[in-house]
Amino acid sequence: DGLRMRFFGLGAEVMQKFGVQTSLLPGGEIFAALEKGAIDATEYSLPVVDQRLGFHQLVKHNYFPGWHQQATTFELLINKDVWNGLTDQQRMILEVITKASVADSFAHGEALEGAEIKRNATEYGVTNHYWSDAMLAEYKAAWLEVVEEQKADPFFAKVWADFSEFDEEYKYWSSIGYLPRPEAPK
């Protein structure tokens, strides 16, 4: 009888290790599920998107950072036969406009989030919480358990090995290229 929460993917498996009952609901069904009491909490998107969906009307606690998804990956899926039927110029146009769209989305998204979480707090009574280092460490430990379980799948094991190799290389850059994590906001 744990917390009932909308969560997706492997992050849901992490949450289950903490006794959370997870379910994957499409975005359009989350508000109604919260309103009816079918779920107690949700993970969905960035604060700007969550606010547009009205979540602030029903849930009054936001937790940051999103440990399970530090970035959003955008994609455009095109049928291979359709792609192969395009001219080089059409392919180039699609590549340029999708890259521009992603850059624009990242820039605007980051620019809007701070004001939105402040507005949620001041106008709608939402409390913003910052995960402690201890809690983030617990999530990481549970995540690594999920990884070990998932590595039984050969494809997952291959992807994880590739990711881990990249991560090891990136750790050096991130250790010297960025400021340390700031203190939690007051």
Predicted regions and their residues:
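N-terminal secretory/targeting leader peptides
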Residues: 1-186
